[in-house]
Amino acid sequence: HVKSIESWLATAGELPLQVKLLIEGEEEVGSEHLEAFLKDNAEQLACDCVVISDTSQFAPGVPAITYGLRGIAYFELKLLGPKQDLHSGVFGGGVANPANAMAKMFGALVDADGRVTIPGFYDDVADLTERERAEFAALPFDEEGFKSQLGVEHLAGEKGFSTIERRWARPTLDINGLTSGYQGAGAKTVLPAKATAKLSCRLVPNQDPHKVAAGLKKRLEEFLPPGIRMKLVEHHGAPGIVMPLDSPYLQAAAVAVEKGFERRPVFIREGGSIPIVNKFASVLNADVLLLGWGQNDDNPHSPNEKFSLDDYHRGIRASAALWQELAAIKKNG
């Protein structure tokens, strides 16, 4: 975007509309101070549309505009039993085992059909429209290639939905990490004093992270045996978001991306979460465009992270066209 602005200034002397740049470096640590900054500077940052580039193309040569993201609710669970690890031969059968209790809890959180069993979990879920399901089905998605890329033989998830629908637009619950007892080499037959785990729910529009947290606590307590204490800590959370497909800003972006990439973009949703999107939309009362130029195999956060120079140049052209297309909306509106 910066390069496209430089190009406009170098060739035309000015931009066709007012552009405000916000460079924020806390995204990887939760953007803790962003919301307060937006509120404190709302008048200076007032705008009709926010452009964020933190997404990707759908596939090589298939540019995409992301119009929806899942939200997230993230938790840490601790189950506490005896004051110290015990000998399972001496005490096993007489003292509740936190690891056993956690295994039973987790086994009950998702049923055989892949549905989350938290009370009220699906009450507020915004269902996909028939248009969305048809457009997702028409995308050039190679399921066998997807499995090969991941190194798995079978895919899993909620019954009644395609792989893309499950990844982009259905809520989930996943265990992100767990530990208990002895993890070293050889055998050590302990009855562990505690078990800890990290878990998260990916949410879709209309689901409230705090309501999900309350439901999760209630569900876990159903399987809490006597002699075990439970601590459930609710960490960061954010609701899902979806932008209307008929938004004039979305349609203007489609024209601009086509000019930059010489191919009409597809409209997609993504399964990840970008909490700042909700903050921009709510605090500034603005539409949000998610335009990403990278590829799914760019290995973000990895030591060998990359970005194609061809995509870089196409992105500059698309961004330059975007300012013109957005200016036309303002002029005609």
Briefly describe each language-model feature range:
Residues 1-30, 75-79, 92-112, 199, ...:
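Alpha-helical metal-binding/catalytic segments enriched in His/Glu/Asp
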